[in-house]
Amino acid sequence: MGIRAFLDKIEHNFEKGGKYEKWYALYEAIDTFFYRPGSVTKTTAHVRDGIDLKRMMITVWLCTFPAMFFGMWNTGYQANLIFAQSPELLASQEGWRFALIGSLAGFDPNSLWDNFIQGAAYFLPVYAVTFIVGGFWEVLFASIRKHEVNEGFFVTSVLFALILPPSIPLWQVALGISFGVVIGKEVFGGTGKNFLNPALTGRAFLFFAYPAQMSGDAVWTAVDGFAGATSLSLAASGGIENVINNGITWMDAFIGTIHGSLGETSTLAIAIGGLVLLITKIASWRIVSGVMLGMIGLSLLLNLIGSNTNPMFAMPWYWHLVVGGFAFGMFFMATDPVSASMTNTGKWIFGALIGVMVVLIRVVNPAFPEGMMLAILFANLFAPLIDHFVVQANIKRRLARNV
């Protein structure tokens, strides 16, 4: 019996009056995941397009694959590179992940398979916990409200998993996605009604609730007992010269062979997926352009001002682009159509605000070298206000024509 036939056979149990009526949202989510919705427009449609919400969300999900697969490889590569340089660390590792990796692969940093299996052993459990726990909350709220499960959770789950450090405990992953889905989205009415990005809301909760597992030098590499600073931390402590002196070139940072979150290190891989989003017009080019212009503008201004005590003032814009979570946030987080500005002019302002804020936080805030998460959440709060003033300005301009 095929999947379609099986789903059709049990459908009556989930319909109104069936014994599993309250779980219709779960059935519908599974059915929609495998097949397109069976309902069609009966009357004349005012807008006709080849893409619906499901296809749009699946496209975004697929566009994260370059960053996802490279992130898995790089997570394993960074760990195996440390094991090759410090064999005593390899001998001290323990736990179920280490046992699983040892049974499927080795620890050779020159082996594509070894690196990928090592990284997958960290990313896939994080993604699985995110998907299962977050999916539970989605189905629960959909069942209570008696509506369908929205496909947007496919995007939220993978984005949340990709912005976490590889060493994060799985129970914290469950707490973070629960906070992001429930507090960041569902309490406001669900998809389309939230004003904060759910994935970033969950990460912000973890950052402030469990800073030891979300920041510092010991969380970015999947090796117990090892501390390795990110490129941004090195720059914050000693400028770009400190980054280069530690053997990290701009090309290393661009390709992504550096310490960092599971899916944020490779600007190249992120840009591949991001360009697809721009070409398909799922992501707004105005927001992306605004983020870039805001970041470049303030970076150049701070370069001109300079500082004898803060080396971050001298950080060039092209380094801001490839370190931290800037690229990932610009393409996948800032362009969230729900929490971003809606008007065309507002999108430029919204993007520029993010670009300016991320540089400002990175350069001026001594306690927080990364700024993309806070910059986007800050802009999310102002998005409705930005759109309000843009609309009011347009109304005044149109009224002035008739005076």
From Swiss-Prot:
Keywords of the record: Cell inner membrane, Cell membrane, Flavoprotein, FMN, Ion transport, Membrane, NAD, Phosphoprotein, Sodium, Sodium transport, Translocase, Transmembrane, Transmembrane helix, Transport, Ubiquinone
Organism domain of life: Bacteria
GO molecular function term, any single one:
oxidoreductase activity, acting on NAD(P)H, quinone or similar compound as acceptor
List localization entries. Cell inner membrane
FMN phosphoryl threonine: modified positions: 230
Q: Which GO terms describe its biological process?
A: respiratory electron transport chain; sodium ion transport; transmembrane transport
Q: Which transformation does this protein catalyse, written as a reaction?
A: a ubiquinone + n Na(+)(in) + NADH + H(+) = a ubiquinol + n Na(+)(out) + NAD(+)
Q: EC no.?
A: 7.2.1.1
Q: Which Pfam families match?
A: NQR2_RnfD_RnfE (PF03116)
Q: Which cofactor does it need?
A: FMN
Specify where it is mainly localized.
membrane
According to the record, the segments passing through the membrane are 56-76, 121-141, 163-183, 220-240, 265-285, 287-307, 312-332, 348-368, 371-391
| GO annotations of cellular component type | plasma membrane
Q: How does the protein associate with the membrane? A: Multi-pass membrane protein
Q: What does this protein do?
A: NQR complex catalyzes the reduction of ubiquinone-1 to ubiquinol by two successive reactions, coupled with the transport of Na(+) ions from the cytoplasm to the periplasm. NqrA to NqrE are probably involved in the second step, the conversion of ubisemiquinone to ubiquinol.
The record describes its quaternary structure and partners as:
Composed of six subunits; NqrA, NqrB, NqrC, NqrD, NqrE and NqrF.
PANTHER family this protein is in?
A: ELECTRON TRANSPORT COMPLEX PROTEIN RNFD, NA(+)-TRANSLOCATING NADH-QUINONE REDUCTASE SUBUNIT B
Give the NCBIfam families listed for this entry: nqrB (TIGR01937), PRK05349.1 (NF003756)
User: Into which family does the record put it?
Assistant: Belongs to the NqrB/RnfD family.
Q: What is this protein called?
A: Na(+)-translocating NADH-quinone reductase subunit B
**Top-down, what is the taxonomic lineage of the species of origin?**
Bacteria, Pseudomonadati, Pseudomonadota, Gammaproteobacteria, Pseudomonadales
Q: Which gene encodes it?
A: nqrB
